[in-house]
Amino acid sequence: MKFTIHAGHNPDGKKACGAVGLIKESTENRKVKDEVMRLLKLKGHTVYDCTVDNGTSVSDIVEKQVEKMNSYSGIDLHISIHFNSGANDKEGNKKNTGTEVLVYNTSGTKYNTAKRICKKIEELGYKNRGVKTRTNLGVLKNSKGQALLVECCFVDDKDDVTLYNYKTMAKAIAEGILNEVIVENTTTSNNTYVVTCNSLNVRNGRGTEHKVVGSLKKGDKIVVWSFANDTKGQSWGSFRYSFNPDVIGYVSKAYLKEVK
């Protein structure tokens, strides 16, 4: 497949740069964009970078992005990477504000892709704010073909930022786009872990405050999709706990050992 991708806004420190909170949008969205590109290319797809770093205004940036996007033919999906703001929760309230994906309308393949991306980011521990239609955004309105805009998480919410890691965020986005689990072939890891304690609770979210939905026994092996921290900084792994595709389990990394 063919994709275009870009990180929104000018770089940090320039006019019309992204939101600034506990982290900076224009720094993080470029890191996420680069990693999504790497993963899509790893799976054999063609990806064009349409990021603009020299815009003179918000509208000029969007115009230049759209011009780049529409210069390529045969594109299956245009991807715009952003971070949200407006939560105003820099101290943290143990509840993250979450993720959402924006589309111009619900027609075509982009809508289901957007839902998958939301679900994948939700698996990292973020609140799923869902897919929303926005008809006033230039990159969605004026691009040719299917397009979506990912609002990864909120830069001004401590709980969002505590969970955030650009690599796990990018992996979730790439997996949502491709509708597959991406496992990189390395000599050191196959993503398989064995349980080291007698009984390990499986929860429906990252953190001990979440409901216990089952348990694993010592010696059980699982394939972990990704690790991310809870609001206390403890690492939790997500995995497919049952044959029900809607059931995602979370276990503490402290009681797992990698199988090499």
Predicted regions and their residues:
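Short alpha-helix capping/helix-loop boundary micro-motifs
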Residues: 206-211
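Extracytoplasmic/periplasmic beta-strand context in beta-sandwich domains
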Residues: 129, 135, 198, 235-237, ...
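SH3/SH3-like beta-barrel superfamily modules
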Residues: 215-255
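SH3-family beta-barrel domains
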Residues: 185-201, 214-218, 233, 257-260
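Active-site-proximal helix/loop segments of hydrolytic enzymes
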Residues: 3, 14, 26-185
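Solvent-exposed coil/turn segments that connect beta secondary-structure elements
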Residues: 8-10, 84, 106, 155, ...
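Predominantly extracellular/luminal cell-surface or secreted proteins
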Residues: 203-205, 240
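Short glycine-rich His-centered loop
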Residues: 1-22
